């Protein structure tokens, strides 16, 4: 969708937002991750998400993230991949990957680019959600 919008001369700005007010994006489905049984399946699963993040990062159009509610795991990566990201005061961000035994390797480059190494490490190791002010204070 991002690549199609990027190639459409009628579209000048892409806004990434949720259709609800409580969750921006909860990231990858835990059930889908548990169903992965081979290296090839794992690579395809995670590369699909990496391709979306890279499409946002490389998009020639202005991309805007509008975070209302929770952004968890991959949702944080999507928000970070946009050119400009706005979040409401009640928005919460959390990297949940370590709690399921993996690192945030797919989203790390985009998030680190936005908030830096120290803030990325803090967000990765923290078990509780952070307020949207965490991004503001670290970007």
Language-model segments: what does each one mean?
Residues 32, 41, 133-134:
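An acidic, carboxylate-rich microenvironment
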Residues 1-37, 55-66, 88-92:
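A structural preference for short, pocket-lining loop segments at secondary-structure junctions
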Residues 23-26, 42, 75, 104:
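Alpha-helix N-cap/helix-start motif
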Residues 55-139:
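Crotonase-fold acyl-CoA enzyme core
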Residues 35-47:
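A short acidic, glycine-rich active-site loop
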């Amino acid at each position: 969708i991002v690549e199609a919008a990027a190639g459409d001369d009628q579209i000048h700005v892409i806004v990434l937002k949720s259709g609800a007010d409580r969750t921006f994006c909860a990231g990858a489905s835990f059930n889908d991750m548990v169903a992965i049984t081979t290296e090839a399946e794992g690579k395809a699963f995670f590369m699909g998400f990496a391709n979306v993040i890279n499409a946002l990062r490389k998009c020639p159009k202005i991309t805007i993230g509008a975070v209302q509610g929770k952004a968890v795991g991959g949702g944080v990566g999507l928000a970070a991949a946009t050119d400009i990201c706005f979040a409401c005061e009640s928005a919460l961000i959390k990297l949940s990957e370590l709690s399921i035994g993996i690192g945030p390797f797919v989203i790390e480059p985009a998030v680190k680019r936005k908030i830096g190494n120290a803030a990325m490490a803090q967000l990765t190791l923290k078990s509780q959600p952070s307020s949207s002010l965490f991004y503001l204070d670290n970007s």
